[in-house]
């Protein structure tokens, strides 16, 4: 709500007077000697868009003064029940149920300042992803990728990551949230790097999948990358205010099925039949995307991918709704959403699929040749505008990505 990252601060907003007050810790000499001074009143007023700053010790009295000027039964809204201040005022009511839903609804639309922070987070992430591409040909372990990414972000002033870095090589890329990042790169075809910097509390969420050398290591790797690239491009270009995000999610599955039919991985059915069977979930098990903001999976009022249960009757891919957290039935200008299709070759998922009727649509013998690819995911953060979209992520992909890998390899030759 305020962008204040300092500990032990409190924030109140008086709706009637439209007054935003930040309460900062009282000065503590011992704490200041050991840890440095805490945020002061003058600094708080200068740094943050607030109406007034006060010390924490005045909070309870301010609440009592506020309550004394209000009618009996006036309500103070708090985020959590354990945040209620202890005040001796029997007629004061606290509500911890209604504030979070209201805040969630407000957070789905970003203003210009918020978009600027997300844009800067993406710029830093792009720089870090590019540094990895320049150095990947000389790296030996997933841990080096993680360390280099962190180093690049911190050097640009972003000390915090939006989420735990995923640096998954080979078959590890088939694990959606792989974070061990401790295996050697030798003999692996691709690396899936899902990593994004945080800037002033706002997140970025960026994924690139790439080889260790400036060429595709196999026909299978190139084919899968091309499929995912098309899935992403087709979905992004359809983003606009009023578009239903769930339709883009289903479109991504249809494109995946079409392309996997072309490769021979799917067989014996039409796009509609395979979609209805759920077979595409074996290879694309997560949602197309989510909001980005103060959290990497940002909150919102209502999720497009988590409709009311009755609204799912007759919809394909019912099992996909949980991973997506987009709210509101249709996209609106000011939303920032990820578009992150992926195709994965998980041994566990394939073994499970063999036991199901949908296995008749999958050429298990052929798909075994793709297991060393692991998985491919490409993810950008996209701003919804009134007449379309703006991609806030500019990390290289495709041919430009390979060119940078090649430049780095030549410098080390």
Swiss-Prot record:
Annotated family: Belongs to the peptidase M24B family.
Keywords: Aminopeptidase, Hydrolase, Manganese, Metal-binding, Metalloprotease, Protease
Organism annotation: Uncinocarpus reesii (strain UAMH 1704)
Catalytic activity: Release of any N-terminal amino acid, including proline, that is linked to proline, even from a dipeptide or tripeptide
Residues given in the record as Mn(2+) 2 binding sites: 194, 205, 379
Protein name (Swiss-Prot/TrEMBL): Probable Xaa-Pro aminopeptidase UREG_07123
Residues that hold Mn(2+) 1 according to the record: 205, 340, 379
Role according to the record: Catalyzes the removal of a penultimate prolyl residue from the N-termini of peptides.
Cofactor(s) listed: Mn(2+)
Keyword hit for Ribosomal protein: no
Top enzyme class: hydrolase
GO biological process: proteolysis
GO molecular function: manganese ion binding; metalloaminopeptidase activity
Entry EC number(s): 3.4.11.9
């Amino acid at each position: 709500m305020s962008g204040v990252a300092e500990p032990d601060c409190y924030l109140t907003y008086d709706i009637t007077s439209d007054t935003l007050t930040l309460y900062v810790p009282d000065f503590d000499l011992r704490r200041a000697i050991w840890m440095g001074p805490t945020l002061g009143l003058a600094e708080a007023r200068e740094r943050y868009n607030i109406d007034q700053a006060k010390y924490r010790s005045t909070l309870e009295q301010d609440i009592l003064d506020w309550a004394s000027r209000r009618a009996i039964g006036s309500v103070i809204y708090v985020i959590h029940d354990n945040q209620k201040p202890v005040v001796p005022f029997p007629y004061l009511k606290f509500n911890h149920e209604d504030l979070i839903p209201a805040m969630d609804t407000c957070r789905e639309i970003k203003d210009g300042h918020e978009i600027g922070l997300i844009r800067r987070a993406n710029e830093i992430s792009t720089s870090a992803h590019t540094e990895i591409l320049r150095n990947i040909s000389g790296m030996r372990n997933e841990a080096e990728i993680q360390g280099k990414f962190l180093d690049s972000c911190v050097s640009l002033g972003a000390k915090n990551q939006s989420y735990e870095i995923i640096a998954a090589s080979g078959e590890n890329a088939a694990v959606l949230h792989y974070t061990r990042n401790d295996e050697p790169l030798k003999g692996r075809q691709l690396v899936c790097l899902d990593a994004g910097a945080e800037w002033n509390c706002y997140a970025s969420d960026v994924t690139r999948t790439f080889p260790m050398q400036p060429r595709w290591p196999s026909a299978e790797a190139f084919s899968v990358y091309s499929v995912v690239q098309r899935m992403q491009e087709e979905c992004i270009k359809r983003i606009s205010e009023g578009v239903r995000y769930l339709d883009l999610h289903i479109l991504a599955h249809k494109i995946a099925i079409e392309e996997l039919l072309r490769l021979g991985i799917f067989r014996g059915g039409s796009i509609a039949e395979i979609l209805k069977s759920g077979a595409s979930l074996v290879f694309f098990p997560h949602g197309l995307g989510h909001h980005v903001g103060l959290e990497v999976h940002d909150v919102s009022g209502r999720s497009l991918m988590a409709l009311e249960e009755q609204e799912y009757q007759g919809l394909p891919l019912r099992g996909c709704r949980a991973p997506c957290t987009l709210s509101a039935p249709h996209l609106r200008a000011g939303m920032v959403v990820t578009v992150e299709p992926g195709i994965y070759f998980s041994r566990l998922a394939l073994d499970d699929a063999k036991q199901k009727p949908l296995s008749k649509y999958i050429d298990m013998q052929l798909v075994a040749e793709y297991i060393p690819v692991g998985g491919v995911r490409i993810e950008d953060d996209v701003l919804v505008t009134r007449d379309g979209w703006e991609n806030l992520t500019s990390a290289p992909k495709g041919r430009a990505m390979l060119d940078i890998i090649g430049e780095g390899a030549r410098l080390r030759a």
